[in-house]
Amino acid sequence: MNTTATVQRRSWPRTRLAALFATLCLLLAACSPAAAEDGPIKIGTSLPLTGQISQPGNEAKRGYEVWAELVNENGGLLGRPVQLIIKDDASDQNTVVSDYNALISSDRVDLLAGTYTSLLNLPASAIAERNKKLFVEPAGGSPQMFNRGFRYLFFTQQAMADQSGVAFANWVANLPPDQRPKTAAYPSIDDPFAEPAVAAMRGILEQAGIQTVYESTYAIDTRNFDTIAAGLKNSNPDLVVHGAGFEDGVGMVRAMRTANVQPKLLYQMGAPGMGEQYAQAIGPENTEGIFFSVSHTPDAATSGNAEFVNRYRQKYNAEPPEDAAEAFATGQVIQAAVQGAGNVKDQTAMADWLRQNSVETVLGKLSWNDNGSPNGSFPIGQWQGGKVKLVLPEPTAQSPVIPGWRPGGQ
């Protein structure tokens, strides 16, 4: 038996041996560093393309895609094409964890890009940190994101959530007494981004003597805002500061209009930055005078902005909202980190490079503190004549503030 087996092993046809050898060579070549470095750079993300946060999530997808398209048209990243792998987390924290685990272990992406909102980026960034992968995210500025000692996390906006409305609150607090609101209301979505921002503004306004007459926190899946609108009507505040995303921001304005609630001043987070989509959702005639913090405007003279805006208009026949611009800027930051490190393998080198350098983006020049939080500030925008104008701080304003919210074409 042994002799026969030996003879059989020695008597394999030469053609089979040649085929086996050729197959092994191909496998080794495919697994070689040279082959991997010639292929596309795979960048993975999971976004809320469905569910409660789908509106900004789909805009973030557009922003990433426009960035990748322009990069590839200009020679790629380190001379290699960029390939996006995008999953849908359905606005769910458990799903986003599964998605990022799959991107790392199954899809074997070279780089990660963040998802949308602090709610989803909190668990997603923990997956990246555990795997020592750079995690640059476009929309997750809650202070909770940056008190965990992470080394690979970076936020691609100008400032943290709790700083987003500070310029507006300071402006209100410093108005002449006869022009300053006497009372304020603070409805807010239960969200790690919105609540710190509202709390910071409330602290400034209360210190200025503006009395709180109403406050409410509602669940992320709230659809009916009639009860809150009724509470606002009964309390009759001069100022409403609303911590919101897109869907609830739209729903709140509609409910306020139905209940005939019209504060002298209205500040909303999130929703007004969606541009034309916001205007169409609440009615263009109802936007006049609404304040909000701004990360991007289409006419900004910032790095790559003209190319981004033009390509977005060509592809989608619309003005790009800031959610798309924030994702595009995330791509710019990832690109700068890769070029700074000179490769896509050394994720620590990329993170170290970002801590030591600033990056020019469509949002302006961004730089970071040691914990990955940005160290800039947000300008404040106001809807005027159907368009967004930067109004605060005054030295950089495009237009003076117009007094009051004027819904219904007043």
Identify the residue ranges that each predicted region occupies.
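Extracytosolic ligand-binding ectodomains
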Residues: N2-A5, F21, S32-Q410
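N-terminal secretory signal peptides that target proteins for export/translocation
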Residues: M1-P13
